[in-house]
Amino acid sequence: MSLRRRTLLKVIVLGDTGVGKTSLMNQYVHKKFSQQYKATIGADFVTKELQIDDRLVTLQIWDTAGQERFQSLGVAFYRGADCCVLAYDVNVMKSFDTLDNWHEEFLKQANPPDPRSFPFILLGNKIDIDGGNSRVVSEKKAKDWCASKGNIPYFETSAKEDFNVDAAFLCIAKAALANEHEQDIYFQGIPEAAVPENEQRSGCAC
């Protein structure tokens, strides 16, 4: 198989169990949403190809389990990340309160060369629930938190309604590209067990 040159961008999605990390990824990559909740065990990833300006990039999005007992997996999966996405449920204050922990955990485990400039993106998910009447974390509170972390970009999303998902991941991809690690990707070198089923690629710029 011939070698294909492209830019591989590794993105890690972190947040408490049940905030919708997997649903956001599936909506972005597969345009599918399931009402059935299935906890992620360990870690999994999906990929999507997209074009940013004149660059063809492969976005590799890692979904790590929110359960504390799986946080020991961090070092292996966080290292080499180009961007970290922090997600919470706007209807669950605890999921917002733990963002500091996730932020610190990532920086500790990933150990980026310059922690102050490493790109983070914050997603406030499930804004569709109860027409927004059940939310407990205000947009202002979330933006204030982002400002305290160096003006992290913030998006309010709904995986179910596909609201703001593409816009959020385009921002994520651009942030990751700015922090890229250029790699030669040999597809035959990826273990079969690590390749997600029904991998979907798109050549369009989202």
Curated annotation (Swiss-Prot):
| Pfam families registered for this protein in UniProt | Ras
Give the record's keywords alphabetically.
Cell membrane, GTP-binding, Lipoprotein, Membrane, Methylation, Nucleotide-binding, Prenylation, Protein transport, Transport
Chief location bin: membrane
Please give an example of a GO cellular component term from this record.
plasma membrane
**Compartment(s) of residence:** Cell membrane
Checking CDD domains in the record gives: Rab7
Query: According to the Swiss-Prot or TrEMBL entry, at which residues is a lipid covalently attached (S-geranylgeranyl cysteine)?
Result: C204, C206
- Which amino acid positions bind GTP, per UniProt? 15-22, 63-67, 125-128
Q: How does it sit in the membrane?
A: Lipid-anchor
GO terms, molecular function:
GTP binding; GTPase activity
Would you say which domain of life the source belongs to? Eukaryota
**What are the Cysteine methyl ester sites (modified residues) in this protein?**
C206
Q: What does the record list as GO biological process?
A: protein transport
Is Membrane among the key words of this record? yes
Q: Which family would the database say this protein is a member of?
A: Belongs to the small GTPase superfamily. Rab family.
Purpose: Protein transport. Probably involved in vesicular traffic.
State the protein's name. Answer: Ras-related protein Rab7
The species this protein was found in: Vigna aconitifolia (Moth bean)
